[in-house]
Amino acid sequence: MADNLVIVESPAKAKTIEKYLGKKYKVIASMGHVRDLPRSQMGVDVEDNYEPKYITIRGKGPVVKDLKKYAKKAKNVFLASDPDREGEAIAWHLSKILELDDSKENRVVFNEITKDAVKESFKHPRGIEMDLVDAQQARRILDRLVGYNISPVLWKKVKKGLSAGRVQSVALRLVIDRENEIRNFKPEEYWSIEGEFRYKKSKFTAKFLHYKNKPFKLKTKKDVEKVTAELDGDKFEITNVNKKEKTRNPANPFTTSTLQQEAARKLNFKARKTMMLAQQLYEGIDLKRQGTVGLITYMRTDSTRISQTAKDEAKQYIEDKYGKDYLSNRTAKGKQGDQDAHEAIRPTSTLRTPYEMKAYLTRDQHRLYKLIWERFVASQMAPAILDTVALDVTQNNIKFRANGQTIKFKGFMTLYVEAKDDKDNEKENKLPNLSKGDEVTATQIEPAQHFTQPPPRYTEARLVKTLEELKIGRPSTYAPTIDTIQKRNYVKLESKRFVPTELGEIVYEQVKDYFPEIIDVEFTVNMETLLDKIAEGDIGWRKVIDNFYGSFKLDVERAEEEMEKVEIKDEPAGEDCEVCGSPMVIKMGRYGKFMACSNFPDCRNTKAIVKTIGVTCPKCKDGDVVERKSKKNRLFYGCSNYPECDFISWDKPVGRDCPKCNHYLMEHKKGRSSQVICSNCDYKEEVQK
């Protein structure tokens, strides 16, 4: 038996670290938390100063037994769980279970799992930081007090199996508030005028800007006619040319939030998937002859700080690959209020390029690693330099403006450009080289009617960004929060955007009326600030909980007495049960709506609700094409006569045949655009709107 025992959370991490430390160290995994509050009871004694009652997590008995066996034989036990509050709490629970000496410095932390970083950390063990543990305990106890008190009220008054949590309730509120904005939105008419102009052989477009040298809003068609009536002929003059040089700086390296956002936009990954892949890259990848190496730094962080060593290595790579002109001369500033003094998410070595790592990674691991690597290296590169030009095109004091932009020096854009949540569809408007006084010819003046649009629903990326901007939750809570409100069927995804369900809105209304603090953004933000103060040792955790629980307990008592029972009525399905002939009804289940026989429990017939798209099956010519969902929740199209007809397609049939070969046409989506195609020949056309 080795003299030194090291305990980490996962087998993958254990395997990587044991190779670095050598034969004198035995590294084993605790498989995450080993102690927690019991599931069968609240586990917090509110009469005894909120003392938590921790028990060994069900199923962890054999793990704890092994940990005790190895700890008894070892001379030294090191606790090397993750470098955050959750990791500190795991170390503390392990210390208690194994009855380790509190005065010993046996806590080891590292931000990256590389040989040098791990070996260096073992030279500087420290004691467990109880302020960090207390911050985690406070969060856990607060969440338990909220969930364990509100959930039974919801079971009694609304429906069994419901829950309401501190952070999840605010996330649900954001989705519902946005939906209400959309419902209450009243579109307003407005117009635009776009002109197409020619200068010699070049053409460019410009948009209406001023009427009689003043800004003029085009609210109606009459406003447009007022402007166009003043135009005389097709000759216009260039009255101003404004050229500027603009620099565009690279984005900072990733934090947890920005990684989740960018992976959603660029890779179409859900937050949970992003974090799972990042964990794998952090804990270690087998690089064959090089051994197992952690490829990225710790992935739960809100810091944009980068170590000097990492900066120097990146700069050397950039100079060798692109030349000195591409080196950044900026001094990047880390975010104020970075928690726990972590670094940003970055590759542990710039020299391990995505191309070289591809052979050792799965497709999705490689895509995420490439994103992290490129974002980090780009953050250390020179800004891009853009030449912008604005042309004023005028006739009779009616002014149009054309804006153009060309890249003078690509800088970091050579490697990486940040994605945007909502890309505008404007094409690049390259402008001819014009001077003040030049004459141009209008080839077309085109008015267009528009209506203002409601605010868009939240994508997962936008919801994560909003939670971070509002300072709700921590890097480790974004993915689980979004996952929870989906699993509870409080929200659903439609076209990759969140829509509240009927159940979600009912739960929200009840929580809003009786537990206003729980869904209050400012209250939740203030609580996060208090948790940070606990971590910094500025306030005691019991005081924070006591200040909250006094008023919350009164809210619970009022809800139990006054909250009216909500009856979620079954909606008629409009068809009869094929088993017993009773009417079918639409019920709300854990995974959404489904059809069930109203004669339950005597008849237990159920079936899924299918949505037809108004197109006859192109294969059997009898059934209807219906929307279905795969096991991975991906939309596909099938025939209502299944299994008699096995028609299936990822692309949506449009109900027309190809004019070239008479095969059926389908709408094929690629990214944000769609095209009607024939799968049998090369025929293509634009989607009819």
From Swiss-Prot:
List each copy of the Topo IA-type catalytic domain by range.
Answer: 129-557
E.C. code: 5.6.2.1
Any GO CC annotation of this UniProt entry: chromosome
Q: Which residues form a coiled coil?
A: none
> Which is a GO BP term held by this UniProt record?
DNA topological change
Membrane-spanning parts: none
One Pfam family, please name it.
Zn_ribbon_Top1
Q: Where is this site: Interaction with DNA?
A: H33, R139, R140, D143, Y148, W155, R300, R488
- What residues sit in the active site? Y298 (o-(5'-phospho-dna)-tyrosine intermediate)
| Keyword DNA-binding among UniProt keywords | yes
The UniProt similarity line reads:
Belongs to the type IA topoisomerase family.
What this protein is called in its record is DNA topoisomerase 1
